[in-house]
Amino acid sequence: MSLINLTFKKIRNEKRPVLLTYTVAGDNSKKKSLEILKSIGKYADICEIGFPHNTPIADGGQIQSSAYRALKNGIKIKDVFSIVKDFKKSKQAKP
């Protein structure tokens, strides 16, 4: 069973809602993005990390702004994977 499925099963047994958060990788800076993930990861059950792209037309205004800031700051796909890797090293087994 995947870590996400295990998390949902655990939370369902606790009879509470799941706190699933979302952030765009690289918004503000690579370092700050990791700090934000570590901070929200203390409370979130699942952390979703978005890849910034230059045509986020299906996303809302806040996510569009975050994606544009990340791209303006030079975030690359390899940086997103690096942020995720560093986050997973610093965090317990959260999806």
Where is each model-derived feature located?
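Short secondary-structure boundary/capping segments within folded domains
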Residues: 10-14, 27-28, 38-40
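Active-site entrance/lid segments in N-terminal catalytic domains of soluble metabolic enzymes
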Residues: 2, 25, 36, 62-95
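Amphipathic, alpha-helical segments enriched in basic
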Residues: 8, 15, 22, 55, ...
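N-terminal amphipathic alpha-helix/helix-capping segment at the start of soluble metabolic enzymes
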Residues: 1-20, 83-88
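Short coil/turn connectors at secondary-structure junctions
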Residues: 14-18, 42-43, 91-95
